[in-house]
Regions:
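Conserved glycine-rich cofactor-binding loop
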Residues: 11-13
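Active-site helix of classical SDR
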Residues: 117, 153, 161
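Residue(s) in the substrate-gating loop at a strand-loop-helix junction
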Residues: 137
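Short, small/polar-rich loop/turn modules that mediate ligand/substrate recognition or access, typified
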Residues: 169, 174, 229-231
Length: 242
């Protein structure tokens, strides 16, 4: 298992569950979020007995990423695992979608994956070891109307995952993606019970996923058990894409 992990979008939901799962398996963790999340970091450190740090970062900004990741790598004394989880949605029909809604989703969901990966790469290459796990989405594989920006961003994350796996493999760095389906997060909690039931009825396992389901898949890909797995997209969707 990695011992020095960085997780973006870690203040809540899937990102927080990933940070907790990595900590539970013995990794020190840096939690990256737009405003920092000291309460969550402190709670993880207390529960699992690992070192945690948190830094505020706009993951769509090159300068912000460079600054935050330098602090993160210095605090950890290196980095052997990066989880690119930060993301937003701004759904809307193309005819009505504002330029900024398209641009902001691409910047936060796709550009950030490039920026954060680049920020850890020199350290991982020097160590000839690294685990990079990108959080994509079922919507990057099998999408729906009204998500042109989000679907494009997540499909891009999948393409970047595959390209980077080929580029970094000779340096001992694996790059994989996890593609969650309908996960029970703050976003889905805001849906009506009728809508949630409608989504659940489409899923072979007959329930929405939990953030912990995604976190366990990430932890597997970060572990030595997955040392010969790279360039892959693991669906965590209850069979929705079967």
């Amino acid at each position: 298992m990695p011992k020095k992990s960085i997780v973006t979008g870690a203040s809540r939901g899937i990102g927080l569950a990933i940070a907790r799962e990595l900590a539970a398996r013995g990794s020190d963790v840096v939690l990256i979020s737009r405003g920092g999340c000291p309460e969550q970091a402190e709670a993880i450190a207390k529960e699992f007995g690992v070192k945690t740090f948190t830094f505020a970062c706009d993951v769509s900004s090159s300068d912000s990423v460079k600054d935050a990741f330098k602090q993160a790598i210095d605090a950890l004394g290196g980095v052997d695992c990066l989880v690119n989880n930060a993301g937003i949605t701004r759904d809307g029909l193309v005819l009505r979608m504002k330029d900024e809604d398209f641009d902001n989703v691409i910047a936060t969901d796709l550009r950030s994956t490039f920026l954060c990966t680049r920020a850890v790469l020199r350290t991982m290459m020097g160590a000839r070891y690294g685990r990079i796990v990108n959080i994509a989405s079922l919507n990057g594989i099998r999408t729906q109307a009204g998500q042109a920006n989000y679907a494009a961003a997540k499909a891009g994350v999948i393409g970047m995952t595959k390209s980077n796996s080929m580029e970094f493999g000779s340096r001992g760095i694996t790059v994989n993606a996890v593609a969650p389906g309908f996960i029970d997060t703050d976003m889905t909690a805001a849906m009506s019970e009728e809508t949630r039931a409608k989504y659940a009825a489409q899923i072979p396992l007959a329930r929405l996923g939990k953030p912990e389901d995604v976190a366990k898949a990430v932890a597997f890909l970060a572990s030595d058990d997955a040392q010969y797995i790279t360039g892959q997209v693991i669906g965590v969707d209850g069979g929705l894409n079967a």
